């Protein structure tokens, strides 16, 4: 490769994704089970695409990111930047394996924090209301949306396995609604009374309920996380009414969340819908239908599913070039 090379890594629900930003951009994803069982190595996959010693800076995310509140070098981070792995959905160990590989690789690497009660840029009322607001990849998604749109005041809704919606004012993230307290995603969602009773009665754990509180609950789907979205869409293609209702209901909860954040904002320049479902047009026009529900607030745009992965690389690039704050989050160097 010629010129500077930046890498972004996202520890997500269905796998670990990498973006390499050099003269061109390249994306690849490794499934969680492949990593946790040792069938795949993140560094082997990475060095097949770029010599590791040519990487100028890498920015990564891990789990909830709730034990750090600044972007900092990985060697300064304790316990992978988390308070606990609990409450984060299904745990397979794949993300932990990748983190350990990167930590010992010698590649210059920054860890991006999540948004939580100790994040200084958040409005104090959000910090008082919720212990956790968004996992770290949402910061990079917002940064990409910020660079792509130029909007200083916007709402970004990332819709996929879960839904998390962020509020940005004057170029700073001031609020967010996490997956367990706000809108539904395909898999995850908020816990309702029935689920709380099942937890109290010992029928299910809170994490089991959280991981079945999204659209899958309505559609009656109980399958692997990596298969849930496709199974839901297969049911929709087959004309199954429970699949249509699941998608319609999920969309309603997201529209409620967006309207709620708009209502407490000081003004919105635009709304960005992203994620595998937020950008979906076929077979169910989720993006178009949701856009119609919120377009009275402001202009609505969609971020390409690959382009949104650039956010971590863009953070690495801009910090390498001297930036010391990302959307209100301090950078330690």
Swiss-Prot record:
Domain of life, per lineage: Archaea
Which sequence ranges form a coiled-coil region, renumbered to this chain? none
Database matches in Gene3D superfamilies: 3.30.420.40
* InterPro entries linked to this entry: ATPase_NBD (IPR043129), Methan_mark_12 (IPR016735)
UniProt record similarity statement: Belongs to the UPF0285 family.
Q: Which NCBIfam families match?
A: methan_mark_12
Name of the molecule in the record: UPF0285 protein MTH_1441
């Amino acid at each position: 490769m010629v010129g500077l090379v930046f890498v972004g890594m996202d520890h997500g629900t269905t796998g670990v994704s990498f973006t390499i930003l050099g003269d061109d951009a390249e994306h690849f994803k490794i499934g969680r089970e492949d990593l946790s069982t040792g069938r795949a190595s993140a560094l082997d996959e990475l060095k097949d695409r770029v010599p590791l010693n040519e990487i100028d800076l890498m920015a990564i995310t891990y789990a909830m990111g709730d034990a750090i509140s600044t972007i900092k070098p990985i060697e300064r981070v304790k316990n992978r930047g988390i308070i606990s792995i609990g409450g984060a959905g299904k745990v397979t160990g794949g993300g932990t394996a990748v983190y350990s590989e990167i930590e010992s690789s010698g590649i210059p690497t920054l860890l991006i924090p999540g948004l939580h009660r100790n994040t200084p840029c958040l409005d104090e009322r959000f910090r008082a209301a919720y212990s956790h607001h968004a996992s770290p990849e949402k910061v990079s998604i917002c940064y990409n949306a910020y660079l792509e749109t130029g909007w200083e005041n916007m709402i970004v809704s990332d819709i996929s396995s879960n839904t998390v919606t962020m509020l940005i004012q004057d170029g700073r993230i001031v609020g967010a609604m996490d997956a367990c307290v706000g809108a539904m995603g395909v898999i995850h969602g908020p816990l309702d009374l029935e689920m709380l009773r099942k937890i109290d009665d010992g029928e299910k754990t809170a994490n089991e309920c959280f991981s079945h509180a999204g659209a899958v609950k309505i559609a009656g789907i109980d399958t692997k996380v990596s298969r849930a979205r496709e199974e839901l869409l297969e049911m929709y293609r087959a004309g199954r009414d429970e699949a249509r209702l699941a998608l319609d209901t999920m969309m309603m909860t997201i529209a409620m969340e967006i309207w709620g954040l708009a209502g407490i904002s000081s003004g919105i320049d635009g709304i960005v819908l992203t994620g595998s479902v937020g950008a979906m047009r076929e077979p169910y026009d989720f993006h178009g239908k949701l856009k119609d529900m919120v377009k009275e607030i402001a202009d609505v745009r969609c971020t390409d599913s690959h382009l949104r992965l650039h956010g971590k690389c863009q953070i690495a690039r801009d910090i390498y070039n001297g930036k010391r704050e990302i959307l209100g989050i301090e950078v330690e160097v």
